[in-house]
Amino acid sequence: MPVTKLLIANRGEIACRIMRTCREIDIPTVAVYSDSDRGSMHVRLAIESVPIGPTPARESYLRVDKLIEACRKTGADAVHPGYGFLAEDPGAVRKIQEAGITWLGPSADVLDLMDNKIAARDQIGRAHV
């Protein structure tokens, strides 16, 4: 199913790059922002923006419930995590997908595998990489 509106669950340059790419392919974007990021470039570039809480990331950008709520509020049907802790959290992936929202990032299974370095090395060896 094609993405009709993308929520970018990150800030700064990575969010801006994703938004510029989305603009080129006509996908509207939603920015989320913490209190201290209200005037940031990624907020100004997005078609829509949603406040998600206080400055500490654990109280805003890493709060999956707030990201899901922002998707529902704006009609965003997909989330791009950018990079960082959210992009590496298999629990976040599962919660977002369980909410019926498309996750544009590594699958939860891959993240689980990569979290276990020994299993990851073995899997890479079996793939002859």
Place the predicted regions along the sequence by residue.
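N-terminal beta-alpha lobe that positions the nucleotide/phosphoryl donor
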Residues: 1-126
